[in-house]
Amino acid sequence: KADGPCRTVTAGFLIGSDGANSVVRDGIGVSWVDLGFEEDWLVVDFKPHDPEMEIDMPGAGQYCDPERPVSTFRWLGRSHSRVEFMLLPGETAEQMTAESRCWELLSRWKITPDNATIIRRTVYTFQSKLADQWRRDRVLLIGDAAHLMPPFMGQGMCSGIRDAANLGWKLDLVLSGRAEATLLDSYTEERRPHVETVIELSMELGRIVCISDPALAAERDESFRSGRAPTLPEFPSLTEGFLHRAIDGQPTAAAGTLSVQPRVCYQGRTALLDDIIGSGWTLMSRVPIHRLELSPSHSSFLSALGVRTLHITQAEVAEAVIDIDADVTRWLDGLDSDVVLVRPDFYVYGIAWRSDAGALVESLRQQLEPHLIKTSV
């Protein structure tokens, strides 16, 4: 337990990003909703004495072995590796974390004390949980403080980054005096159902990997060999919150999907688009911005919201962003549109033809307006 001096800090908001055993979550009385996955796995991190040592394991792999399911990660950074072993019935954390036992398990890949050093050995319980609330007044939860998932899709930290990106742009509007705190209600609305779907996908992969019954494992293997195994659904898009919507309320084409990350050139600098434009809302168009049918009030709204407007083209046009590899061109061709409005968290708000750009901006204004402070935006 912490035994250092106490300090009092005053802030507008408190973000609990303090992990699965979150003190912040417990402090505001938020409970877990258990989605029903729980397996103990031994995690062993090791460092080869020679970083270039040949090890016969995939860069990232799942061994669906009923005798003991295993996950391997050849490279963690430039010099470390990781192997994870599922605990079998009757095995304890104390037994499995014994150094001699870890070397015994690693010997499968000819990893020994002579050629490597174990730097960590611990047992984790892989779980699937969601906090029942992500916001209570001026306290919000992100990352493992808000959700836990099995690691089989590698989406735990990714989901936490999505949380931060989603909450960040909304907090910016609130703290800069442009929006009311009601805007923050959309954080839970948008992120919770998305991460719940990701957890369910991770659980499904975990169920495939963690089979230890030989007969069931044989059935699984045959279903893959024969092609009868069902495919996993596509990675989820955003479906709730601030998205361009059709008359029936459903997101329009591309709304809620992730934007592209092309190589571009702007004012003599070549880089990825995000490095050129920075953070914030972005209106990208393959026709010059002045040719879009935007009213003065729409232009004023975009300016107050801090929206960056970009003309992106393959031609070398003054003040335009050059689409070096035609990634944006192909993307917009596939979307059958000229214009795309991208949120600060890089999700697409909506797309439009140049003649409908004003309607696209107007729909965003109508969605945000109930939360905006009138004198600011």
Language-model-detected regions and their locations in the chain:
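Core Rossmann-like FAD-binding/catalytic domain of the broad FAD-dependent monooxygenase superfamily
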Residues: 1-221, 310, 351, 377
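Helical substrate-recognition/capping region of FAD-dependent monooxygenase/halogenase enzymes
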Residues: 104, 173-377
